[in-house]
Amino acid sequence: MSAISQERLLQVLLAPQISEKATYVADKNEQVVFKVATSATKPEVKAAVELLFKVEVKSVQISNVKGKSKRFGKMMGRRKDWKKAFVCLKPGQEINFVAGE
């Protein structure tokens, strides 16, 4: 497998997914949840998290999330589909999004 370019890795992670479920998973299983690019793969997500946050990743699970149907005035529209990555960190590793560091 060829090395993944650093430019590509910087485009893979879009944002941390902060929700009630993500907080529960983080506390119970030492996992962090990210919104990722729809074309992202597990090895890319793992490499991007290790590069940006300087932590060791144990495993990555990815799920595709279907966009919701929404009304925009009289018209029915649809939000975009997106991808969610559950990143399991090795014991002793942690990413803190609340602190300003």
Curated annotation (Swiss-Prot):
Domain of life: Bacteria
GO molecular function, one term: structural constituent of ribosome
Pfam families found in the cross-reference section: Ribosomal_L23 (PF00276)
Organism, as annotated: Azoarcus sp. (strain BH72)
Keyword flag Ribosomal protein: yes
Signal sequence, renumbered to the chain: none
The UniProt record lists the keyword Translocase: no
Name of the molecule in the record: Large ribosomal subunit protein uL23
Physiological role: One of the early assembly proteins it binds 23S rRNA. One of the proteins that surrounds the polypeptide exit tunnel on the outside of the ribosome. Forms the main docking site for trigger factor binding to the ribosome.
Subunit (UniProt): Part of the 50S ribosomal subunit. Contacts protein L29, and trigger factor when it is bound to the ribosome.
One of the record's GO cellular component terms: ribosome
A biological process term (GO) from this entry: translation
HAMAP family tied to this protein: Ribosomal_uL23_B
Keywords: Ribonucleoprotein, Ribosomal protein, RNA-binding, rRNA-binding
Family that this chain belongs to: Belongs to the universal ribosomal protein uL23 family.
Matching NCBIfam families: PRK05738.1-3, PRK05738.2-4
This protein's encoding gene: rplW
